[in-house]
Regions:
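Bacterial Sec-exported substrate-binding components of ABC uptake systems
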Residues: 1-79, 193-227, 290-296, 340-348
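A short, structured surface patch at a secondary-structure boundary
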Residues: 74-128, 132, 141-148
Length: 348
């Protein structure tokens, strides 16, 4: 997934419009080291004992003699498990910002207490990972090959030899599916999810989904565009591969949808526009990528952006292309969009 391997697609581009953009097209050559799968964590609810088995979304079944406690996970997965009482100690992926604060993808975790094996793309300390003696590695996957997200292509084989891996697919499915998978993973690791905080969070998610459904039905004329900003390119996401957009669309949200021919260069994930052409698609609401590697709306200086009707109307809301897959963290994604649609003025 290096810049060289991505040819004309930049790394920023690959990350821009849905987490993995053209992993199908861009990373097909990467393949995947079909590493064994497994996932788990040590936790506040760690009363489980005995053998541990988990079948991941690659169809790979991981079997360990005991429930793992030395878990290493992609930071977003670790943050979701944390919400269920499973305290992952080792992470990789965007964990800390340049000033040392928690990245948006770290959720509620105390990042000062985490062992970080790599904080940016293509960075993963194999030596540090080996010394940690992991029992399992858990990540998401953005393609049909099961490529482990944020596990570098150059070192994936070495990493795979040190511990089995578990992959949670976030490719071409609705948000509810990976939510259910992480729930099952947490439960297998000893989390008590049948009552209390977790059960309540699930109910609140379901209520938020119903609110969004009603808002979309009441305001079918409101057009929503999902965007992501880089210095030279504005990415317009399609809805057919991203877990959040697929789900919102299923709930009835009226999205801007670039034609497949326009999304081809982006592996089917997005269309790239120059800032001069950022007004190509009329939109009443713009959802903007909230990840730290993208330019945030307040920092966009392009005049063409500032002239957009949705921007002038203050109808720009955040979007999390790589949502933390716990019900508690995904509920606000639904309520924020529902509220935006309910209050939106028809400006496009």
């Amino acid at each position: 997934m290096s810049n060289a391997r991505a040819t004309h697609l930049t790394r920023r581009g690959i990350l821009a419009a849905g987490g993995a953009l053209g992993l199908g097209a861009v990373l097909a050559a990467c393949g995947d080291d079909d590493a064994k799968s497994g996932g788990s964590n040590e936790a506040a609810g760690a009363g489980k004992s005995g053998p541990w088995t988990f079948e991941d979304d690659r169809g790979t079944k991981v079997k360990l003699d005991k429930v793992p406690t030395k878990i290493v996970a992609f930071v977003g997965v670790a943050a979701a498990l944390y919400d269920y009482g499973i305290a992952v100690k080792g992470v990789f992926g965007p964990t800390k910002t340049k000033d040392g604060k928690a990245d948006v993808q770290a959720g509620d975790m105390d990042v000062s207490k985490l062992t970080v094996f790599g904080n940016v793309w293509d960075q993963f300390s194999v030596e540090k990972y080996a010394a940690f003696a992991p029992e399992v590695l858990i990540s998401t996957t953005f393609d049909s090959a099961g490529t482990l997200w944020y596990v570098p292509e150059a070192s994936k084989d070495k990493i795979a030899k040190l511990a089995p891996s578990v992959a949670v697919s976030v490719y071409d499915r609705q948000l509810t599916q990976p939510l259910e998978r992480v729930w099952a993973l947490a439960e297998s690791l000893g989390a008590d999810l049948k009552s209390g905080k977790a059960a309540q969070a699930k109910k609140e998610f379901e209520a938020a989904a119903e609110r969004l459904r009603k808002a979309a039905k009441a305001r079918p004329e409101i057009k929503v565009m999902a965007g992501s900003a880089s210095q030279d390119i504005f990415y317009v996401s399609g809805t057919n591969l991203s877990i959040d957009l697929e789900y919102f669309k299923a709930l009835g949200v009226n999205f801007v949808e670039p034609p497949e021919s326009a999304k081809k260069e982006g592996g089917g994930w997005y269309e790239s526009l120059s800032w001069e052409n950022v007004d190509k698609y009329p939109a009443d609401i713009i959802m903007m990528d909230d990840r730290t590697q993208t330019i945030q709306p307040a920092d966009i200086s392009e005049g063409t952006w500032k002239k957009l009707p949705a921007v002038k109307a203050g109808q720009v809301v955040p979007r999390s292309p790589e949502p933390i897959l716990s019900y508690a963290k995904c509920t606000p994604l639904l309520t924020n969009l529902a509220e935006a649609i309910e209050k939106a003025k028809k400006v496009a």
